[in-house]
């Protein structure tokens, strides 16, 4: 037990999950720009839904990075206020919820044969969904 107490705490470990998840969502959202009605039609989605998907992916990626900066001491002591931490926590949770909604829609549109097909063969979307769910449930208290 003494050995475990000697291991230093790495309080910035949430960045190891936050950065790759944000990059994937930013990359997917930016790759859809400029979006058009033809893009939405190719996925058989209404234009408004496609608009929310594109800006949701970009916003969730930016929100996840920005909220991490808001709750860390990277931002500096002058904005290290209580309400900034709460706002950062809410932004993290909202970004996670948006990620879960978008990935759920992607899985739904792919029309898998069963739940097990998603779990066994759609690993990327399962990991993106679980990553979004992690931040939605934990917020910035990681």
Cite the ranges covered by each PLM segment.
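Extended, low-polarity transmembrane helix blocks
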Residues: 1-34, 38, 48-142
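Short, structured beta-strand/loop micro-motifs enriched in basic residues and often containing a Trp
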Residues: 43-47
């Amino acid at each position: 037990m003494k050995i475990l107490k000697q291991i230093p705490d790495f309080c910035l470990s949430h960045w190891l999950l936050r950065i790759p998840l944000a990059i994937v969502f930013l990359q997917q959202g930016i790759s859809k720009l400029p979006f058009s009605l033809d893009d939405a039609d190719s996925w058989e989605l209404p234009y408004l839904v496609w608009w929310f998907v594109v800006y949701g992916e970009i916003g969730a990626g930016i929100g996840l990075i920005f909220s991490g900066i808001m709750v860390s001491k990277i931002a500096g002591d002058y904005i290290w206020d209580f309400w900034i931490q709460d706002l950062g926590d809410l932004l993290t949770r909202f970004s996670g919820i948006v990620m879960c909604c978008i990935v759920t829609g992607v899985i739904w549109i792919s029309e898998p044969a069963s739940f097990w097909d998603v779990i066994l063969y759609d690993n990327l979307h399962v990991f993106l969904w679980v990553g979004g769910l992690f931040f939605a449930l934990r917020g910035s208290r990681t």
